[in-house]
Amino acid sequence: ATIGPDLSHRRTIVAQVLRTQIVREAVRDEMKARNLSRRDALKVARGYAYEIAANYSHPFVVFMSGVLGRLWNRLYDGVELANFSSLESVEDGAEVIYAPCHRSHMDYLLLSYVVYHKGFAVPHIAAGINLNMPVIGSFLRRGGAFFLRRSFSGNALYTAVFMKYFGLMMARGHSIEYFIEGGRSRTGRLMQPKTGMLAMTVRSYLREPTRPVVFVPVYFGYERLVEG
């Protein structure tokens, strides 16, 4: 399987985000708005960056691929793929954005498992902050998850840090996965798509068009949902 682009240490990524102009300007605005010292405002920004950033571990992904292979055969009658050739035909060097429907918590595990076994880099996955729980949050980060809050409203510093982290992932060529519906369907039916992450993807590309962007829609169909 492909490891993908340079997987710098999480601390390195955070440091790169904090050095960018957009974040430095947001830090200055935070200092003025909350009457903070530069050190304290930077501490807030750094906290946001660590809250967001993935902590991808390739050995962990290799281990989990074996665990998940056994899990699929236990829960389901195997895994069937359709139209995977559309991904295989994507040109080398393109930025791949997986945009799946979201019917089960198994979705992101299944997509990572499939692309890994097909020889592609495991995507970085946008996950809701509600999943950043003790143990589970660390588990997901090591599999490539990065976390976002449900609302960015009223927090310009958090917005700047998240947008720059997301843009940096794109510029570095990491494939990214986000659920276009915004959340998990509780009924199993497809929901109306939301445009927040899509708009952020377009803005990031327009600011730094280093490579073509290819959107890959993904549909999951299950014999039964483990959530009931």
PLM ranges: what are they?
Residues 1-228:
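Membrane-interfacial terminal anchoring regions of lipid-handling membrane enzymes
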